[in-house]
Amino acid sequence: MAPVSDRKTFRDLADPDAAAAAIADLPIAPEPPVEAVPLDDAAGRILAERIDAGIDVPGFDRASLDGYALRAGDTAGADEADPVRLEVVGTLHAGEAPGAAEVDDGEAVEVSTGAVMPPGADAMVPIERIDEIASESGAVSDVDVRTAVAPRENVMPAGADLAAGQRALGPGTRLTPREVGLLAALGEESVPVRARPTVGVLSTGAELVPPGEPLDHDSGQIHDVNAASIAAAAREAGADVQRYSTADDDPEALAESLRSAAPACDLLLTSGSTSAGAVDALHSVLEAEGELLLHGVALKPGKPTLVGRLGDCGYVGLPGYPVSAMMVFRTLVAPAIREAAGRPEPERASVEAELLEEARFEPGRRRLLPVGLVEAWSDATTAAGDPDGDRTPLTYPVDRGSGATTSLSRADGLVTVPAETSYVAPGERVTVELFSPAVRPPSLLAIGEDDPGAAAVMDALDRPRYLPDGTAAGVRRLRAGVPDVAVVAGEPRRDAEGPEIAAWEREWGLAVPAGTPEDVATIEDLAGSDLPFANLASGSGLRAALDDRLDAAGIDPATIEGYGVGLRGHESPARRVLTGDAAAGLGLRATAERLDLGFVPFGTQRVRLIGNPDRSDAAGRSALQGVTDRLPELLASISGYEAA
């Protein structure tokens, strides 16, 4: 058995405080001028209208780590003592179309983080759990898989981060670097410029495309989030930002990009190409072109961080995932920029809050946990020593993974968890460091079904937060006391407990190509056929209704092609029909008509707003009641909707 790839591994991780000190010692000379830079003049502005996602993010099933793509069923029973051997039939990197790299039974394809999942594969095994076997030519011919995986494990499905048609940002939002990153992911443009030291920002990765340009999802292209969000954060810290064109992962191209940018900058920030994968080569380029001071920080997110020098220019290599990049910048880089710019440290604001849901961690690295706030009191808080019943913020985790652009836009602050801590229990007091002193909890927090009617209600409120994570999530988190209101569709097996504030009916069924072709007139037409079907994910009220319909009709879901692959957003299945990737998709009449598709009706489903019984006198609930009194007016423009 012979290793065939030259992967650099993380060995001695730097303490976060030592990493901050190393960055503070970099030669960052002050530069006071302020100028406008394309794309970034929206930071600090107030959003005037709602922004809906026009695309799925990501637009393809994406590998979440370096390893091998395979069929999960082939790994059944695999472990360290009894590995499963698979034939290697290809290699696939980020930014490449799968081509002939297709996975069949007993086969695997080597895949880099962020690459498109090859056809036939439904899971990823990390490289750390693989033994590569070389042929006589030195190329990998087979792999021994030392762990079993489940379908979808280590895979980020298309639309898992943000689904087309979902409400991304609401009117009245102050655009911070978090929101700028989200807008960049959606293809929007612009932010204001103000800074002092000259800071260069360079993204790496062949898969990155500037916002505003079309994406080729078949090649795994995504909008360049980091260039926009990191540049915005550097300006906010006081830097004059110089943006550079995206560089490929090729070592020589990276070296040329660094050589070209460094002389004009006091500090050069890159994102991506810093981890231990074979394609990620910045650490080697930095060693050859300058001085590598450290590689790897005991921080999560943020482990694959680089610090070094390129001549007289300081250098920091940020991780490629947007959340990781922004966390490292905020924690380690921004203080050094502010010091060089002569700016005082910003006023820090923190609050003591009660954690509503448990949080579990792997010990060994300091954890930065994004959290949201709900301003309320609780019986537990009063019993714990607050006899006056003063308002105490409640907090809940919003971490959706380092690759999810929305994690920070949904958050109000961070909880720093010590490296030795592995569990924080519900009800524990935690310190939340707010993203700014101006942060306030939303006027109303709603969690539940992704529904156009609920979105219309939220738009009529001042500063709400609506997390369209599905009926099951809304019910579960309402039981934990997280939202003010749960959006519940249908009759979930475990119903929400609380008063019904408002309700409406929505017409649901199948979205089909325009003209309602005769080959899909009912759900029965899909059973046993080879017609591809686009479904919603489990946890959606619509998905539960369709499951019940099939059960009542005696139809095995396994006989419907694609039934088990769930999409996240309520418009996602219909959009698959629109692009020709599905013959039918589960959805709403409102969606089908908006996209000029045909529609096969199945009936109506009731959607309810269920209030948190412990927050009946909250100000947001009173405002919501006033809005729901106008429910017929709010729903009038949504086809297939009627107030109950």
Question: Where are the model-predicted features located?
Answer:
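Periplasmic-binding protein-like
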Residues: E505-E507, L597-P632, A636, E642-A644
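N-terminal hydrophobic or amphipathic helices and topogenic motifs
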Residues: V398-A473, V482, I523, P632-A644
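Phosphate-binding glycine-rich loops and their immediate beta-loop-alpha structural context
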Residues: N154-T270, T274-S275, P442-G470, R476, ...
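Ligand-binding cleft/hinge of the Venus flytrap
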Residues: A456-L461, S538-Y563
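Phosphate-interaction motifs
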Residues: A2-E189, V351-E354, V417
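Ligand-binding clefts/hinges and TM-proximal coupling segments of bilobed small-molecule sensing domains
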Residues: A527, L531-A552, T628-A644
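Flexible hinge/capping segments at coil-to-helix
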Residues: V512-F533
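Flexible glycine/proline-rich
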Residues: R62, V285-F435
